[in-house]
Amino acid sequence: MKIGAPREIFEGEARVAMTPDSALQLQKLGHHCVIETGAGMKAGFSDEAYAAAGVEVLPSAAALFEAADIVVKVRGPERAEAERLRRGQTLISFFWPAQNAELLELCKEKGATVVAMDMVPRISRAQKMDALSSMANIAGYRAVIEAGNNFGRFFTGQVTAAGKVPPAKVLVVGAGVAGLAAIGTATSLGAITYAFDVRPEVAEQIESMGAEFVYLEFEEAQDGAATGGYAAPSSPEFREKQLAKFRELAPEMDIVITTALIPGRPAPKLWTEDMVSAMKRGSVIVDLASERGGNCDLTVPDQKIVTPNGVTIVGYTDFPSRMAAQASTLYSTNIRHMLTDLTPKKDGVIHHNMEDDVIRGATVTHDGAITFPPPPPKVAAIAAAKPREKVKELTPEEKRAAEIATFRKQTVSQVAMLAVGTALLLFVGMYAPPSFMAHFIVFALACFVGFQVIWNVSHSLHTPLMAVTNAISGIVILGALLQIGSGNVLVVLLAAISVLIATINIVGGFLVTRRMLAMFQKS
């Protein structure tokens, strides 16, 4: 089948749904790729690059819609684009079906199948197709870069000959994909980073990234997690505590990045006008929720404004498009994974399996019918765990008796082994020469000490332990090499085996050491 990517006609959109690299992968599935001329130009992909990847470049959108069996886009289709769809054709793009009922109806009437990338279920198997997370990751990163562009100081603290520069203080509100990306970027730039989220389970994630989680003093336990990893609306009491905490933090923060969204609702207002007034001159607010009304009272969508007290508020809604090359690469990879699932036999034929949770969840029209909203994903039933028998609590006297019994058992075992070993040594000593006994005793002690040392090493330290054994193996191989010149055939054979085994250990040890050290290198 032919997969076509038209040029995005939404104003300011620079992304493209197919890159030369993704086109090569799609062709391996048996598909033929076409693209409208100039579609990838804003993202840095020329028509020549597509042609070199085996993609047919068509002169117009009309020609592309006519030729393609599957149309891949970034933005949802404009009405003029939807009018070009035909029965049996498949459209894969962001669609937002809940907000575009008329467009959904038009696609149904046209008989086209629409796969909405924003409707991909939030389940583990579908992570490779989760375009929302891919774009949110870019938005969080770009938000910090945009804040730094409008902030008049360093992120990291510095001590210079000209004086001391304090580090910037950054507050990230909302620790979803975009929020975590912003936290990671701000922390890596050296800023003192704080983060807040209504879901208490993300506190550990935030702290593991080097940021400080902002806790609220709230009597009732508030869990703001909803289905799909999103946040749920907060209670009025919790919201008041939340706003009070933000008012307390506002005068201290240099940069505030807000990312809070609730599915199907306008963005919650979390940074009020009085908080903006309390911020220092030169501070920056980046509102990633501006497309849904914004988390800040003063946000103006698609604009950057400066308040009378000198606070810059960035309300851009096209952060991923501002990194068009990277965004196009990630989005086209998400599209490729979706098409891989739609082409299970890799024969260039789409098989739209509506029994598949991911495909069913993302499909909003199919066979002339609207299939939105989808049913909840099927979850495999898990058998209830058998109740464990309660372990009887031992009294101090019973614990003491058990410890004594264990000690006696171990003592008897060790004394018996010692007696047998002593008898064996005496027996061998009666017939063996003194030189042999000296070597044999050293060997026995080495085995005993080595066993005790290795046995008591924690499992987590076995990898560095393998690296250290290179030195021991080096001693073994030297001893074996000295014995290879012996006139005894048996000694030579044993020495050769020793060299082989020690060599394997040395090579393996160096390999493990290399891999262990590579974990600490920044790629």
From Swiss-Prot:
Disruption phenotype annotation: Loss of transhydrogenase activity. Sensitive to aerobic methanol, but can utilize methanol as a sole carbon source in the absence of oxygen. Not defective in formaldehyde oxidation under anaerobic conditions. Increased specific activities of other NADPH-producing enzymes. Has higher levels of glutathione disulfide and increased sensitivity to oxidative stress agents like diamine in a succinate-based minimal medium under aerobic conditions.
Cytoplasmic topological domain: 1-411, 456-464, 511-523
SMART domains assigned: AlaDh_PNT_C (SM01002), AlaDh_PNT_N (SM01003)
One cellular component term from this protein's GO annotations in UniProt: plasma membrane
Localization in the cell: Cell inner membrane
Family: Belongs to the AlaDH/PNT family.
Protein name in the entry: NAD(P) transhydrogenase subunit alpha
Species per Swiss-Prot/TrEMBL record: Cereibacter sphaeroides
Gene name for this UniProt entry: pntA
